[in-house]
Curated annotation (Swiss-Prot):
Major role in the synthesis of nucleoside triphosphates other than ATP. The ATP gamma phosphate is transferred to the NDP beta phosphate via a ping-pong mechanism, using a phosphorylated active-site intermediate. It comes from the Bacteria. One of its GO terms (biological process) is CTP biosynthetic process. The gene is ndk. This is Nucleoside diphosphate kinase. The keyword Nucleotide-binding applies.
Length: 137
Protein backbone atom coordinates (compact mmCIF):
# COMPACT_ATOMS: atom_id res chain seq x y z
CA UNK A 1 0.00 0.00 0.00
CA UNK A 2 1.26 3.44 -0.91
CA UNK A 3 0.94 6.53 1.22
CA UNK A 4 0.75 10.11 0.01
CA UNK A 5 0.32 13.54 1.55
CA UNK A 6 -2.69 15.71 0.87
CA UNK A 7 -3.21 19.28 2.03
CA UNK A 8 -6.57 21.00 1.89
CA UNK A 9 -5.47 24.59 1.33
CA UNK A 10 -6.78 27.76 3.02
CA UNK A 11 -9.23 28.63 0.22
CA UNK A 12 -11.04 25.29 0.49
CA UNK A 13 -11.00 25.36 4.31
CA UNK A 14 -12.53 28.85 4.23
CA UNK A 15 -15.23 27.67 1.78
CA UNK A 16 -16.24 24.90 4.18
CA UNK A 17 -15.65 22.02 1.76
CA UNK A 18 -13.30 19.91 3.91
CA UNK A 19 -15.89 17.14 4.29
CA UNK A 20 -16.70 17.09 0.57
CA UNK A 21 -13.02 16.75 -0.31
CA UNK A 22 -12.47 14.00 2.27
CA UNK A 23 -15.50 12.18 0.83
CA UNK A 24 -13.79 12.16 -2.59
CA UNK A 25 -10.76 10.43 -1.07
CA UNK A 26 -12.74 7.87 0.92
CA UNK A 27 -15.14 7.15 -1.96
CA UNK A 28 -12.11 6.29 -4.08
CA UNK A 29 -10.54 3.86 -1.62
CA UNK A 30 -8.01 6.23 -0.12
CA UNK A 31 -7.96 5.66 3.63
CA UNK A 32 -7.03 8.53 5.95
CA UNK A 33 -4.19 7.30 8.21
CA UNK A 34 -3.46 10.66 9.85
CA UNK A 35 -5.06 14.08 9.77
CA UNK A 36 -4.69 17.43 11.48
CA UNK A 37 -5.87 20.97 11.02
CA UNK A 38 -3.23 23.62 11.62
CA UNK A 39 -2.09 27.13 10.85
CA UNK A 40 1.22 27.10 9.00
CA UNK A 41 3.81 29.65 10.04
CA UNK A 42 5.83 31.48 7.40
CA UNK A 43 8.81 29.34 8.41
CA UNK A 44 6.73 26.14 7.96
CA UNK A 45 5.51 27.15 4.51
CA UNK A 46 8.94 28.31 3.33
CA UNK A 47 10.51 25.04 4.48
CA UNK A 48 7.77 22.86 2.98
CA UNK A 49 7.92 24.61 -0.40
CA UNK A 50 11.72 25.14 -0.35
CA UNK A 51 11.99 23.31 -3.68
CA UNK A 52 10.24 26.34 -5.25
CA UNK A 53 12.37 28.97 -3.48
CA UNK A 54 13.89 30.37 -6.68
CA UNK A 55 10.61 30.37 -8.62
CA UNK A 56 8.83 33.71 -9.18
CA UNK A 57 5.63 32.48 -7.47
CA UNK A 58 7.34 31.40 -4.21
CA UNK A 59 6.44 34.46 -2.10
CA UNK A 60 2.80 34.44 -3.25
CA UNK A 61 2.57 30.69 -2.57
CA UNK A 62 3.94 31.10 0.95
CA UNK A 63 1.66 34.10 1.63
CA UNK A 64 -1.35 32.10 0.44
CA UNK A 65 -0.48 29.00 2.48
CA UNK A 66 -0.25 31.05 5.70
CA UNK A 67 -3.44 33.02 4.98
CA UNK A 68 -5.61 30.58 6.94
CA UNK A 69 -5.71 27.08 8.39
CA UNK A 70 -4.97 23.98 6.33
CA UNK A 71 -5.90 20.32 6.77
CA UNK A 72 -2.98 17.94 6.32
CA UNK A 73 -3.62 14.23 5.73
CA UNK A 74 -1.82 11.00 5.02
CA UNK A 75 -3.81 8.99 2.49
CA UNK A 76 -3.20 5.27 1.95
CA UNK A 77 -4.27 2.95 -0.82
CA UNK A 78 -3.25 1.18 -4.01
CA UNK A 79 -1.41 3.67 -6.23
CA UNK A 80 -2.23 6.39 -3.69
CA UNK A 81 0.06 9.04 -5.21
CA UNK A 82 -1.41 8.83 -8.72
CA UNK A 83 -4.96 8.23 -7.52
CA UNK A 84 -4.81 11.39 -5.40
CA UNK A 85 -3.34 13.38 -8.29
CA UNK A 86 -6.11 12.15 -10.61
CA UNK A 87 -8.76 13.11 -8.04
CA UNK A 88 -7.22 16.59 -7.61
CA UNK A 89 -7.13 17.39 -11.33
CA UNK A 90 -4.88 19.83 -13.16
CA UNK A 91 -3.08 22.51 -11.12
CA UNK A 92 -5.00 25.18 -13.02
CA UNK A 93 -8.69 24.58 -12.23
CA UNK A 94 -9.65 25.99 -15.65
CA UNK A 95 -7.82 23.02 -17.18
CA UNK A 96 -9.05 20.44 -14.65
CA UNK A 97 -11.50 17.80 -15.81
CA UNK A 98 -15.09 18.12 -14.59
CA UNK A 99 -15.64 16.19 -11.39
CA UNK A 100 -12.11 16.67 -10.07
CA UNK A 101 -11.52 18.45 -6.76
CA UNK A 102 -9.95 21.48 -8.40
CA UNK A 103 -12.64 21.79 -11.07
CA UNK A 104 -15.32 21.67 -8.38
CA UNK A 105 -13.76 23.66 -5.52
CA UNK A 106 -10.75 25.72 -6.68
CA UNK A 107 -10.82 29.42 -7.58
CA UNK A 108 -7.57 29.91 -9.49
CA UNK A 109 -4.16 28.45 -10.23
CA UNK A 110 -2.98 29.99 -6.94
CA UNK A 111 -6.03 29.22 -4.78
CA UNK A 112 -6.37 25.69 -6.13
CA UNK A 113 -7.89 23.94 -3.08
CA UNK A 114 -5.45 21.06 -2.58
CA UNK A 115 -1.83 19.92 -2.64
CA UNK A 116 -0.78 16.35 -3.29
CA UNK A 117 2.61 14.67 -3.38
CA UNK A 118 3.88 14.17 -6.93
CA UNK A 119 5.99 11.04 -6.32
CA UNK A 120 6.48 8.29 -3.75
CA UNK A 121 9.83 9.76 -2.73
CA UNK A 122 8.33 13.23 -2.22
CA UNK A 123 5.36 11.69 -0.40
CA UNK A 124 7.70 10.12 2.17
CA UNK A 125 9.50 13.43 2.72
CA UNK A 126 6.29 15.47 2.87
CA UNK A 127 4.62 13.05 5.28
CA UNK A 128 7.69 13.18 7.56
CA UNK A 129 7.55 16.99 7.48
CA UNK A 130 4.10 17.01 9.13
CA UNK A 131 3.73 13.69 10.97
CA UNK A 132 5.75 11.48 13.30
CA UNK A 133 5.49 7.74 12.66
CA UNK A 134 3.35 7.25 15.79
CA UNK A 135 0.73 9.66 14.43
CA UNK A 136 0.13 7.49 11.36
CA UNK A 137 -2.19 4.53 11.92
Amino acid sequence: MEQTLSIIKPDAVKKGVIGKIIDRFESNNLRICAMKKLQLTRCDAEAFYAIHKERPFFKDLVDFMISGPVVVMVLEGNNAVMKNRDLMGATNPKEAEAGTIRADFAQSIDANAVHGSDSLENAKNEIAFFFSTREIC
